[in-house]
């Protein structure tokens, strides 16, 4: 996104996120109300919380699959995603098996993504690649390879991070590499550690087309009023 984006422009790209294990249904209802007030794109909640978010109404609902480790069997990820879509989720953020990617088993990564893609027809599929781990434990070529596999498997977005991996969250370097790899054919979601307006603008300038934020209000307030 060129130039300085407005508050509303950024809000329209935000998945307002609550994935803490201790989150309650009441917390999710409050999240949805806040999301509607802030004018964000969607909320992102745990699969078991999708019904509460959908019932609260007024905002798109995204969820996760294989979260946060990505070590679930592909059939489990696919079933989890399918159940969430049946409950009203319109977007699914799945986690790859990072170990498989680091070992160079890209066919396994592709099959994993394809399983979830087949189970979520009509929903937007984002593939979480844990970019900090791939860059820290391997190199840019590994990250590029995973992004291209995600594209081949039918993903709509590649996403930097769960926000739970010890290697860290989003970085402008990772977003730039990912955006270059998919060349505008897929969206790029930056998520994990984006806490300020400066962080958000930097990610958008690097090529992100969606942001995953838990502290959304603070980020938007940092952008001022339109």
Curated annotation (Swiss-Prot):
GO CC terms in record: cytoplasm
Source organism of this protein record: Mycobacterium marinum (strain ATCC BAA-535 / M)
Catalytic residues (positions): 93, 159, 189
UniProt cross-references to CDD domains, sorted A to Z: DeoC
HAMAP family with a match to the protein in the record: DeoC_type1
SUPFAM superfamilies per the UniProt record, alphabetical: Aldolase
Domain of life: Bacteria
Main location: cytoplasm
Transmembrane regions: none
Family designation: Belongs to the DeoC/FbaB aldolase family. DeoC type 1 subfamily.
Protein name per its UniProtKB record: Deoxyribose-phosphate aldolase
Metabolic or biological pathway: Carbohydrate degradation; 2-deoxy-D-ribose 1-phosphate degradation; D-glyceraldehyde 3-phosphate and acetaldehyde from 2-deoxy-alpha-D-ribose 1-phosphate: step 2/2
Reaction equations catalysed: 2-deoxy-D-ribose 5-phosphate = D-glyceraldehyde 3-phosphate + acetaldehyde
GO biological process: 2-deoxyribose 1-phosphate catabolic process; carbohydrate catabolic process; deoxyribonucleotide catabolic process
């Amino acid at each position: 996104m060129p130039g300085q984006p407005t508050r509303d422009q950024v809000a329209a790209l935000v998945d307002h996120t609550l994935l803490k294990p201790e989150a309650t249904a009441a917390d999710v209802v409050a999240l949805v109300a806040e999301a509607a007030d802030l004018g964000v794109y969607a909320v992102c909640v745990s699969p078991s919380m999708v019904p509460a978010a959908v019932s609260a109404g007024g905002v798109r609902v995204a969820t996760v699959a294989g979260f946060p480790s990505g070590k679930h069997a592909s059939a489990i990820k696919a079933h989890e995603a399918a159940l969430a879509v049946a409950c009203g989720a319109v977007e699914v953020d799945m986690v790859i098996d990072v170990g498989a990617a680091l070992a160079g088993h890209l066919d396994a990564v592709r099959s994993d993504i394809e399983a979830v893609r087949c189970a979520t027809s009509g929903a937007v599929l984002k593939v979480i690649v844990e970019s900090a781990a791939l860059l820290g434990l391997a190199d840019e070529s590994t990250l590029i390879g995973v992004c291209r596999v995600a594209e081949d498997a039918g993903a709509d977005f590649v996403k930097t991070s769960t926000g739970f991996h010890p290697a860290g969250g989003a970085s402008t370097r990772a977003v730039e590499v990912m955006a270059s790899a998919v060349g505008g054919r897929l969206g790029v979601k930056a998520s994990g550690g984006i806490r300020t307006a400066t962080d958000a603008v930097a990610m958008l300038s690097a090529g992100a087309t969606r942001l995953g934020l838990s502290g959304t209000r603070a980020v938007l307030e940092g952008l001022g009023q339109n």
